[in-house]
Amino acid sequence: KQIQKLGYTCLLETGAGLPSNFSDKDYKDAGVRIVKSASQLWKDSEVILKVRGPEKSEISKIQPNQHIISFIWPGQNKSLLDSLNKKKTTVQAMDMIPRISRAQKMDALSSMANIAGYRAVIEAGSQFGRFFTGQITAAGKVPPAKILVIGAGVAGLAAIGTAQSMGAIVRAFDVRPEVAEQIESMGAEFLMLDFTSDGSGEGGYAKPASKEFIKKEMELFREQAPEIDIVITTALIPGMPAPKLWPKEMVDLMKPGSIVVDLAAEQGGN
């Protein structure tokens, strides 16, 4: 409705709303024109709004001088930028919106990260072999699950809150010591590294850590791995591939039946 008030005609691929329980009729009633295929949508639209950036199969469908609003990750996707440049496409990279109060209403990255953090715990729970919360039964005692969340940004904090509410013992690590208060306020334990320099960067983001810091970090993770049932990694560095924090060495130290959920997989994985 807000877009239509600006004078735009809205188009939607048929069936696109079904995973969110919105039928084509719901959109038609709201004045949206339904098109039969994604190809037709690309052909008939001047402005494309989508969550993920254009896939390789979609590059050929882009029209000259088309406008795309999406997550682009320009620092990691030079080939995509080159392809868009050849098409003379105007791009708004939603992942590049600064973390400031004035831009908060446009912070699509944080809203998606919040969903991802919640969903990470739900998916881990569906694969885990027992309840998150501890139980005392006539047959004996079942200990609560121990969950480690690496990275306490929006996704990490959402995962911490969800896991805590489900009765798990939650530990969290972040290279930025200033997030300790947020983690502890949610009932989780903050794993602190005794180090003179940290990984705090500008705008609340992390920055690449020193070799000495990484060495201490790996030592901490080696201590935690045998105890932890579920690891959820969320660490990202703007404009760079995701840092490698939980390699095969850590996985091998974990108990049989343990779960690893890597929310940074799209950017190279933690």
Task: Label the predicted regions.
Residues 31-46, 53-54, 200-252:
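A structured beta-alpha segment of the ubiquitous adenosine-cofactor-binding alpha/beta core
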Residues 24, 59, 81, 121, ...:
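Generic hydrophobic/aromatic pocket-lining and core-packing "Φ" positions
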Residues 56-146:
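Glycine/serine-rich phosphate-binding loop and adjoining beta1-alpha1 elements at the start
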Residues 1-22, 133-224:
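Glycine-rich phosphate/diphosphate-binding loop of Rossmann-like nucleotide-binding domains
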Residues 14-17, 39, 53-54, 73-74, ...:
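Short, ordered loop/turn segments at secondary-structure junctions
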Residues 1-83, 87:
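An N-terminal-biased, well-structured beta-alpha scaffold segment characteristic
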Residues 74-103, 240-270:
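Rossmann-fold NAD(P)-binding glycine/threonine-rich loop
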